[in-house]
């Protein structure tokens, strides 16, 4: 059975576009800046939502899409996205410590660490399995150990330190604020001393399908129940699916992702296209 979300849809005849957020291995091209320059890394999910977003949705991708839809006052963007399948959705400063450029870069250091932890042997694959689940959630028996080398050849792929700072600000704030630049710069950028909050309740026009799990430690169920489901307009929630025994990585790499997530999403889109 095909285990790739993209190929499940492509094999069914759908056009598929894959996006890479800024800072990842394939998201480092710029018309005037180079990744070696600090200015290149002056972005967070604010800029991803404002300038970069495409119809993709897993983990941080859901936060970016929710934010972009919340900023869509005239509904022009929502008209382009008929249905949005949000997998492991996320709703709700250590700048000097992390530096000012990229965080978890795709370079020789992370490659060496990944190779050391995630080797080719069965024992090494199991060790890698355990290390990854420390941040994603408890082991679910969905991990395909034979694909470990493929997964770790591209991950981690990197992001900006500013993006990590923005995430920390959001955690401390308890909601979804724009990036906090400090009072002086906030006044210049936003016209007020504090960053504005994004109102997910303002989202309209796009049907949202939520796929989440109690075992996901990053797309936390408390965040889903106490924030997303309360903030989103019930009229836009087309589906609210609580999957059993999915950790954060299983939505992309789990053996059960195709039958429990990808194929149901494919059926919804196919029925929609056929007018059923």
Please state what every model-predicted region is.
Residues 217-223:
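Conserved alpha/beta-hydrolase "acid-adjacent" motif
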Residues 40-64, 84:
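Alpha/beta-hydrolase fold nucleophile elbow
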Residues 27-47, 65-68, 244:
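Catalytic cores of eukaryotic secretory-pathway lumenal/extracellular enzymes that build
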Residues 236-276:
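Catalytic active-site module of serine/aspartate enzymes centered on a nucleophile-bearing elbow/loop
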Residues 63-190:
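Alpha/beta-hydrolase-fold enzymes
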Residues 1-33:
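Short, surface-exposed "cap/lid" segments of acyl-processing enzymes
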Residues 203-204, 209-212, 216:
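Short beta-strand/loop motif that positions the catalytic acidic residue
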Residues 192-205:
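The feature captures the conserved acid-bearing segment of alpha/beta-hydrolase catalytic domains
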């Amino acid at each position: 059975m095909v285990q790739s979300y993209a190929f499940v849809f492509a094999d069914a005849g759908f056009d598929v576009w894959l996006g890479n957020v800024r800072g990842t291995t394939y998201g480092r091209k710029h018309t005037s800046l180079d990744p070696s320059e600090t200015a290149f890394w002056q972005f967070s999910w604010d800029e991803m939502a404002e300038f970069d977003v495409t119809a993709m949705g897993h983990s941080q991708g859901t936060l970016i899409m929710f934010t972009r839809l919340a900023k869509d006052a005239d509904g022009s963007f929502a008209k382009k996205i008929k249905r949005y399948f949000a997998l492991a959705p996320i709703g709700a400063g250590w700048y000097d410590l992390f530096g000012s450029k990229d965080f978890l870069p795709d370079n020789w250091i992370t490659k060496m660490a990944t190779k050391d932890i995630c080797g080719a042997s069965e024992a090494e694959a199991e060790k890698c399995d355990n290390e990854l689940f420390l941040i994603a959630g408890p082991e679910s028996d969905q991990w395909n150990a034979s694909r470990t080398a493929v997964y770790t050849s591209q991950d981690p792929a990197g992001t900006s330190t500013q993006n990590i700072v923005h995430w920390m600000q959001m955690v401390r704030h308890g909601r979804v604020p724009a990036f906090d630049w400090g009072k002086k710069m906030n006044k210049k950028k936003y016209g007020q001393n504090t960053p504005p909050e994004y109102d997910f309740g303002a989202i309209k026009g796009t049907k949202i399908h939520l796929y989440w799990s109690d075992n996901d430690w990053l797309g936390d169920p408390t965040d889903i129940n106490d924030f997303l489901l309360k903030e989103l307009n019930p009229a836009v929630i087309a589906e609210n699916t609580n999957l059993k025994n999915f950790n954060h990585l299983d939505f992309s790499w789990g053996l059960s992702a195709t039958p429990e997530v990808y194929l149901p999403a494919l059926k919804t889109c196919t029925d929609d296209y056929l007018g059923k």
